[in-house]
């Protein structure tokens, strides 16, 4: 017990040190305080969100059942920073200005064949969907650290959203929408994490696979 306590004491400062200066942690590494599972079934209703050793784990509670986890608080203009370490074959995402159903500007964490990490997608915005549904699909592979933690940072600001994305501090995306395509023209919303649903026709999650998140923090921007 003493050895475990010592190990956790040594790990905790390392986790805190990964939160950038000027950012406020919104995940305490202990439980899901400040977050909630979506009350809708739009993305699924998986309860497979748990916390272990300072890491937020996402896995389907039954094969194919996805879901989203949202902050209780809504944000307007902000920058969010987090570390991600997904299993290969698992499709996830970081939602910006999300509503309860998960309609949002999405920064993709689609870690699977043909997927995108750091790309921008209009989740639930029919006016934005093209053949691939991707608004921006950057060249991310050369900046990705395989089987390791990767720092993802995203910034959204303006009534007409201007979105920037960095992967391991390398700029990937600097994009401004042509108009505000959010549902109802929303200019604020929740931050959300996604585990994608999966089926035989749309295999988006490796059975038993995980997405892992830690050091989630936000910096609210002045208007």
PLM regions: where:
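Positively charged n-region of N-terminal signal peptides that target proteins for export
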Residues: 1-5
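Bacterial N-terminal signal peptides
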Residues: 7-17
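Carbohydrate-interacting regions of secretory-pathway proteins
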Residues: 19-223
């Amino acid at each position: 017990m003493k050895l475990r306590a010592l190990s956790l004491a040594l790990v905790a400062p390392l986790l805190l040190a990964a939160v950038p200066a000027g950012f406020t942690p919104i995940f305490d590494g202990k439980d899901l305080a400040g977050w909630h599972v979506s009350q809708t079934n739009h993305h699924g209703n998986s309860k497979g969100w748990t916390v272990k050793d300072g890491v937020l784990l996402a896995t389907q509670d039954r094969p194919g059942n996805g879901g989203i986890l949202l902050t209780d608080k809504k944000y307007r203009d902000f920058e969010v920073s987090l570390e991600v370490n997904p299993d290969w074959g698992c499709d996830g995402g970081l939602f910006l200005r999300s509503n309860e159903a998960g309609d949002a500007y999405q920064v993709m964490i689609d870690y699977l064949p043909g997927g995108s990490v750091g790309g921008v997608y209009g989740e639930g915005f029919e006016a934005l969907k093209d053949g691939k549904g991707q608004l921006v699909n950057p060249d991310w592979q050369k900046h990705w650290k395989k089987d390791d933690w990767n720092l993802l940072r995203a910034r959204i600001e303006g009534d007409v959203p201007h979105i920037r994305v960095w992967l391991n501090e390398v700029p990937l995306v600097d994009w401004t929408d042509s108009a505000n395509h959010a549902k109802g023209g929303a200019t604020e919303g929740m931050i959300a994490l996604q585990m994608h649903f999966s089926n035989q026709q749309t295999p988006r999650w490796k059975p038993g696979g995980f997405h892992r998140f830690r050091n989630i923090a936000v910096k609210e921007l002045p208007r």
